[in-house]
Regions:
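TM-adjacent membrane-interface loops and short helices in multi-pass inner/ER membrane proteins
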Residues: 105, 217, 339-380, 387, ...
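Canonical positions in the second alpha-helix
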Residues: 504, 537-538, 571-572, 605-606, ...
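Alpha-solenoid helical repeat scaffolds
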Residues: 516-517, 547-551, 580-586, 601, ...
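Extracellular and organelle-lumenal recognition/adhesion modules and their flexible linkers in secreted
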Residues: 11, 188, 611, 634, ...
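Hydrophobic alpha-helical transmembrane segments in integral membrane proteins
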Residues: 320-334, 475-513
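Alpha-helical transmembrane segments of multi-pass inner-membrane proteins
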Residues: 2-4, 13-16, 23-48, 62-70, ...
Length: 859
């Protein structure tokens, strides 16, 4: 016994612990549920193509088909998840509640009820003006609400299919997410490297030149990459964590850190401000997910060191030119625009509280209250604050469901932590926080890919079923109904986008856009009867469709029903400023009636949307001579329209023929508190000078805020090379061979703007000049050189405009040699004076002292 014991002890001392045998990774699956390939294909397709947006309905249909196929092959999946109880069952209840709210919004209501709902005044007014009566759902946009209901299918399928997976196989869903994110990262880096013209954008996007990857929007790409960055740190997502030990685990950890580093580069490539702002959160969540499962001091040190290096890499990327370009956008106008959207959305919420306006109704509802001052070429497609948009469209019930969802997810996360799934709990919670952060300024969950990603993260938090869980009872009839409705809707939308509204209205007769576009085509073809009928069908579905109301009104007018058409046009005006043909019609009708004051708001709306600028500016110019027209224009200018400079430039063409009218308009602008600035009237002064009207030149100069005898004496309005030709009160650099004049900031301690004159020593003459209007008399010209300036000071001279005879101005310099002054005497009969810097052809004078300020005062 002793020998045997010693022999056994010896064997124990020399025994080498062997690693468990490597086996191919298996994906056990409960009986009756989908095989993993169906689920994997669906998740991959949804994440790869789900960033396409609403302009690709057939892609959305493909994703829905994949979801239905996966659910078809897993008829018992919902039952398996329901059987888990707790958080899993609560999430299913929340899905049902959200879908139920949408379904209730689609239930037709009697006229007295739906018209009495808050926020339905415009809809009721349009129906009254159009002569329409009958029942209507609570949603103002029932076709879009139905689309939102069908859009729940992919997230629901993702949640059910992943939640029904056994615990050890769930990480496969995260692995799909990380792989797709890496593909998007590589594509995004290639996109930003290739520039705006690179043929690497899979979808039409306004973010060309930026790394949008597999999305149409930079922020949505950044959101997916941040989620994947966190997920990559979960053990088992990158490499077979549970089947390896020691050195192999360290190798896997290094690969996971490298994957996260690549994803961080992709985030920077998006130039997303929100993405960069949430990058630290993603790093912390990934660090926590990796740290909670690290065993041994060496492994923990490797994890912390790697994540510290990753944080350093992110800092370097942020400080790179690409990162700085994104950071500069933090001080841009985007935040100001969003704040305006939020304020307007809050107004809409108050008007429709507590029931909301219906899911999908944001755009037409927002257009109905969008202020004139905020109009622009691009319309507002979302509130850019998803929580506000949910409140607007779903009302108080949506708020309660959303609050319950937050509480359920928080409880599920805590439950996952207590079950020993700390890494998954931290990663999933971190990913959901990233989406919540983006939802504060964007609408990520309205993109199919991110909705599916969110559903996967929630599914990872609920308890996993046992492998032998019952399959449940198939419910395939519902899947067929969903598939049929989705197919008809998406095919109908694709036909609309293809310019076939008649076919679309037959395939999906519940689509208002199909009937509206069909009515527009009929009106253009002269079929007024068909246009009236089909526009009416569009309004029956979507009563606040401004385009459909306008088409029906114009068709009525074309049929001789002037009163009915005008009445409907009046109701259409309350639906906003966004329908250009309606605005043009109302402007023309007001002008024909001699009501310039009524026409100007509609002209203003068109110009703000860059519609018909040249013709409308010409129309405005024709209104200036009439007192009522001028008053209406001044009133429009008080709203600071973007077309103001274009109008003043157009007015320059009339300045020579109607100088008094122009001067009177400028004076009225000043009295109204929106005075023209000197730079805005530069072209007017130039045209007056070309006509020899020097008195009006001075009058316009004073009316536009010109307080000095000389324009821009401190060069504050100048930057870069000066123009060779310019009008009065504007500095110019007359063309001289080998001479350049450039304005720029002073890099020295003095600050301010500086004017630099450089010569090759051969050119001579007036290198810098300005034309001004001066009354006869004596004037004092002051010249200040830049502090510490080196080089020749140059000579100054003046000449009566048109004479060509330059008379010198004797500049007396003070002791410091930087400040000097001289006098000039303007005789009678000199309508305008040219004052300028004279240089000689001395080769020794190549660098002239930079100018800091020029002044001109009467003695």
């Amino acid at each position: 016994m002793q020998a045997a014991g010693q022999s056994g002890a010896g064997r124990q001392r020399t025994r080498v612990r062997s690693a468990p045998p490597r086996r191919p990774m298996q994906w056990p699956w409960p009986r009756g549920l989908a095989r993993p390939n169906a689920t994997g294909v669906f998740l991959t397709l949804a994440l790869l193509l789900g960033g396409a947006g609403i302009n690709y309905p057939l892609i959305q249909l493909a994703i829905v088909v994949a979801a239905v196929v996966a659910l078809w092959r897993a008829p018992g999946a919902p039952g398996v998840v329901w059987a888990q109880g707790g958080a899993a069952r609560a999430v299913l209840v929340l899905f049902a509640a959200w879908a139920g709210l949408m379904a209730v919004q689609l239930v037709p209501l009697p006229p007295g009820l739906w018209r009495a709902l808050p926020g339905r005044d415009n809809a009721a007014a349009v129906w009254d003006a159009a002569g329409l009566t009958g029942w209507h759902p609570a949603s103002l946009t029932p076709d879009l609400t139905l689309a939102g209901l069908l859009a729940l299918v992919p997230p629901f399928a993702a949640f059910v299919l992943v939640a029904a997976m056994p615990r050890r196989t769930r990480r496969g869903a995260l692995r799909v997410l990380v792989v797709v994110a890496l593909i998007g990262t590589v594509l995004g880096v290639l996109q930003i490297a290739g520039g705006a013209d690179a043929p690497l954008y899979p979808f039409i996007t306004a973010n060309r030149g930026i790394g949008t990857g597999l999305f149409v929007d930079r922020n949505h790409q950044a959101a997916l990459l941040l989620i994947a960055l966190i997920a990559a740190q979960v053990p088992g997502v990158v490499g077979a964590w549970h089947t390896t030990e020691g050195k192999s685990r360290r190798h896997i950890r290094i690969v996971a850190l490298a994957v996260s580093a690549v994803l961080a580069i992709g985030v920077v490539a998006t130039l997303s401000r929100t993405g960069l702002g949430l990058l630290p959160l993603a790093l912390l969540a990934g660090m926590a997910a990796a740290a909670v499962v690290s065993t041994g001091t060496g492994e923990r040190r490797l994890t912390m060191a790697g994540l510290a290096l990753l944080a350093g890499l992110c800092l370097v990327l942020v400080l790179s030119p690409t990162g700085q370009e994104a950071m500069q956008r933090f001080s841009g106008v985007g935040d100001e625009g969003r704040r305006l959207y939020w304020a307007n959305t809050l107004d809409a919420i108050r008007a429709a509280w507590p029931l909301g306006t219906g899911f999908g109704s944001f755009v037409p509802v927002y257009m109905g209250l969008e202020p004139m001052s905020q109009l622009g070429p691009e319309y507002v497609n979302h509130a850019h604050q998803d929580f506000l948009e949910i409140v607007l469209e779903g009302g108080v019930v949506a708020v309660l469901i959303a609050a319950a969802a937050v509480a359920t997810v928080a409880a599920a996360g805590w439950g996952a932590w207590r079950r020993g799934e700390a890494a998954v709990a931290l990663a999933a919670s971190g990913g959901l926080l990233v989406l919540a952060g983006f939802s504060l300024v964007e609408y990520p969950l309205r993109m199919t890919a991110l909705g599916v990603a969110a559903a996967v993260l929630v599914a990872l938090l609920v308890p996993a079923p046992e492998a032998a869980a019952p399959a449940g009872r198939p419910r395939r009839i519902g899947l067929l109904v969903v598939l049929a409705l989705s197919a008809l809707s998406q095919i109908g939308l694709s036909l609309v986008l293809a310019g076939a509204p008649s076919a679309a209205s037959r395939v999906a007769p519940w689509l208002s856009v199909a009937w509206r576009n069909r009515a527009e085509a009929e009106l253009a073809a002269g079929d007024t009867t068909g246009a009236v009928a089909d526009a009416g069908l569009a309004l029956r579905i979507l009563p606040i469709d401004a385009t459909a109301a306008r088409v029906r009104a114009l068709a009525l007018i074309a049929r001789g029903d002037m009163a009915g058409g005008a009445r409907l046009m009046g109701a259409d005006a309350a639906l906003g400023w966004r329908d250009p043909p309606a605005q043009l019609w109302m402007a023309q009708a007001a002008l024909l009636g001699g009501r310039a004051d009524l026409a100007l708001p509609h002209i203003d709306a068109l110009l703000r949307q860059n519609v018909g600028e040249a013709a409308l500016v010409q129309e405005l110019r024709g209104l200036v001579p009439a007192p009522a027209g001028e008053a209406a224009i001044v009133d429009a200018l008080t709203r600071h329209p973007g077309w103001r400079q274009e109008f003043l430039n157009g007015l320059a063409e009339d300045a020579a023929a109607e100088p008094d009218d122009v001067a009177h308009l400028l004076a009225d602008m000043a009295r109204a508190g929106v005075p023209a600035q000197p730079g805005e009237t530069a072209l007017i002064r130039w045209r007056l000078a070309d006509a020899g009207l020097w008195g009006p030149v001075a009058q316009v100069w004073r009316a536009s805020g010109g307080r000095n005898l000389l324009g821009d004496g401190d060069f504050a309005g100048l930057n870069g090379p000066l123009p060779a030709y310019a009008g009065p009160y504007v500095w110019r650099a007359p063309p001289l061979p080998g001479v350049s004049v450039t304005a720029g900031a002073d890099t020295g301690a003095g600050g301010g703007r500086r004017l630099h004159v450089v010569s090759d020593g051969l050119g001579q003459g007036m290198a810098l000049a300005q034309t001004v209007v001066l009354a006869p008399g004596r004037y004092r010209l002051g010249v200040a050189l830049a502090p510490g300036a080196a080089g020749a000071a140059g000579a100054w001279g003046w000449a009566c405009h048109g004479t060509g005879t330059v008379q010198p101005i004797d500049i007396a310099w003070r002791g410091d040699g930087r400040n000097g002054a001289g006098t000039l005497a303007v005789p009678a009969g000199c309508p305008a004076v040219e004052i300028g810097l004279l240089i000689d052809s001395d080769p020794a004078h190549r660098g002239w002292a930079p100018l800091a300020k020029i002044t001109l005062d009467a003695e």
